[in-house]
Every structure is written in C-alpha cells, then in structure tokens.
C-alpha cells in the first residue's frame, strides 16, 4: 500500500510578506516594475549576524525559510534535506568571476567561490540544524523544485526517511537581470503586477524567493495537506495537454470532475501564457482558477510558491481575492492541482488533497 505524504510545515520568503505564517496574503503588495525583489524579514532573528554578513541574499533567504518551516512543524528531527534551484548562488558566482577579470586571475578571495556552488544553501541549512543525513540539490531549470519534491516523495514512500526538508530557492542578480532583459525574457517596460493577466507583450516580470516544506509520512496537528504526487515533462505540446492531464489524474483515481481549484503559473508572457489558456479550457465549470506570479515574479523555482499557496488554501479554506482568476463553485477546497511551465518547456503537475 502506498504511504501517505503530508506537508507538516512551510516557510516562505517572497516579494510578499509571506515570512509571517500567522496570516496568508492579507496585505498584498502591488508592484509596477519589471523585477520584484524579495521582502526580507529581520534576518537577525534567524541567523547569527556575524555569519549573515558573509552570506549572499539567496543563502539568507533559504536558511530563514527553512527555519520558519521547521518552527511551523514544531521542530521535528530532519532525516534529509533536498533543495532545488535554477541558478544557485548566482550573486557570489558573479563576484568571483568579476574578481578573476578585475585582478587578472591573481590574489583572488576564495569566499565567493566557496559560496557560489548550487548546493551552498542545502549545506548551510544542514550545518545550522546539525543534520548529517542525505543532502542533495537538483538543478533542473524550472523543474528543479519538482525534482526535489519527487526525490523526497520516493524516499518517504520507501521508508528511507521519515521527515524531509524540501525547498526551492533562487535569487536575483544584476548581471542575470541584464541578460534576461537583453533576450526579452524580462519585459522591457514596467508592468502593473495586478494587471499582469491583461499583458499583451512578450517577457515576464522576474522575482526571487525561497520556499521550504517539511514533508513526512506521519500526520500531525500542524499538517496542511496531503501530497498525492508530482509529474514532470521536459517538452509538451498544447494539443497533448488533455491526455497528459487525464492520465495524471487517473493515476491517482481522480477525474477532472474532482478538481476544486487549479493553481497556474501565468506570468504575463503573451507568447507562452497560451499554454494555461489551453489548460483552463479543459476544466469543468465549477473548478476555480488561481494564479500567483503577479505577486512574486517569475524564477526557476517559483512553482514552490504555488505549493505554498495551495497548502495554505487547503488548511485555512480561505482564498485571497488577489489570486482568483475564476472563483471555485465548490464550498470546500479539497483537491487542488498545480500546473507550471516556463517558455513552453519544463511542464509540471502537482496534486494536493485535504487530510479529511
């Protein structure tokens, strides 16, 4: 018999004030820009200041989001830490490469190099919470977080671990922003975030953030939802969305009729949001349609925020108006499906269910 997997705690650092788990999007920040920086908590509350000074923003976000998740789950013993990231600690990478050029490859400071690897966040979290177990980082572009989620799910189902910390983390950097603007992946003109669905231009608004989750095969008082499964597709044509969706739901003994809401990764790119329009055309009339990237921007592990959103919705049964594209006709949100893709590639489906 397949073991159940529960989301027992979560922590989020994003372009909204999500670091406070006492409420969920009660005060939404609206932006008019092309890049949305994360709203940081007081890092002194989570990281020793002498250590924080030497950390890049992405590392601080990751450690803090992880600690918030652990506190939210009542500080369980963690058997493994699995992270996903698209660009890793890119700020330190840029610092090190810049110093190579500026100093003619001599007298280099090693710190940026040591902290520039993609697994820096996972390693720093392990040191901080004294976890000596399995520690792995996935770098699979916009499927990075889902790869980490799938790994954790398999380990829990096979009893290789009892409680796992899983997260997605990506940070903004000046150089990467310039490159994405140059190739039109970021919009050329400032866009009002609350009007993103009406965008008629190419490119997205970009962001950064860290979202961590405590997964376990044991339910507890802090449990948010049950994770039924996740599926990834590197490439997927629009005309095949229907059969892939039906097959994914069928694998979990569900149909389109069972979906109470879907959480979609609309990012305002007129060229690729059509995937979501095709997807929504398949849904039943009672199924709610929700979106979130107008709140946090686009980045490789932005889909982790979708899991955070769906988990909050299932536990608290309250849907903030700012994320509703079409209101659900169901009185209770029991089954929620997440669908994300980036520029027509790296498609992912994740399914959550209430614990009742």
Residue ranges with predicted function:
Residues 1-136, 146-150, 154-158, 167-356:
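Conserved "HGTGT" condensation-loop signature of ketosynthase/thiolase-family condensing enzymes
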Residues 141-144:
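Catalytic nucleophile serine of serine hydrolases
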């Amino acid at each position: 018999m397949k073991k159940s997997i529960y989301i027992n705690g979560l922590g989020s650092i994003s372009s909204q004030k999500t670091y406070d788990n006492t409420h969920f999007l009660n005060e939404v920040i609206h932006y008019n820009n092309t890049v949305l920086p994360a709203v940081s908590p007081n890092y002194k509350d989570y990281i020793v200041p002498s250590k924080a000074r030497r950390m890049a923003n992405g590392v601080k976000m990751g450690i803090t989001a992880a600690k918030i998740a652990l506190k939210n789950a009542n500080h369980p013993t963690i058997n493994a830490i699995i992270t996903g990231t698209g660009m890793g600690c890119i700020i330190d990478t840029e610092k090190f490469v810049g110093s190579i050029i500026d100093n003619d490859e001599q007298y280099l400071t090693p710190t940026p190099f040591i902290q520039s690897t993609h697994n820096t966040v996972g390693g720093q979290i392990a040191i901080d919470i004294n976890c000596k177990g399995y520690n792995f980082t996935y770098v699979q572009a916009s499927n990075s977080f889902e790869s980490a989620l799938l790994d954790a799910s398999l380990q829990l189902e096979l009893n290789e671990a009892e409680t796992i910390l899983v997260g997605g983390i990506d940070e903004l950097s000046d150089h990467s922003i310039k490159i994405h603007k140059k190739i039109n992946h970021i919009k050329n003109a400032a866009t009002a975030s609350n009007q993103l669905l009406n965008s008629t231009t190419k490119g997205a608004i970009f962001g950064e953030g860290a979202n961590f989750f405590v997964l376990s095969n044991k339910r507890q008082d802090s449990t948010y939802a049950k994770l039924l499964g996740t599926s990834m597709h590197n490439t997927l044509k629009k005309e095949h969305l229907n059969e892939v969706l039906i097959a994914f739901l069928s694998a979990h003994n569900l149909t389109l009729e069972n979906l109470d809401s879907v959480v979609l990764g609309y990012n305002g790119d007129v060229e690729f949001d059509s995937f979501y329009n095709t997807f929504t055309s398949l849904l039943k009339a009672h199924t709610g349609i929700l979106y979130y990237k107008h709140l946090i921007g686009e980045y490789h592990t932005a889909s982790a925020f979708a899991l955070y959103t769906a988990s909050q919705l299932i536990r608290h049964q309250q849907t903030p108006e700012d994320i509703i594209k079409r209101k659900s006709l169901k009185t209770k949100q029991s089954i929620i499906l997440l669908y994300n893709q980036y520029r027509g590639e790296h498609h992912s489906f994740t399914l959550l269910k209430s614990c009742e």
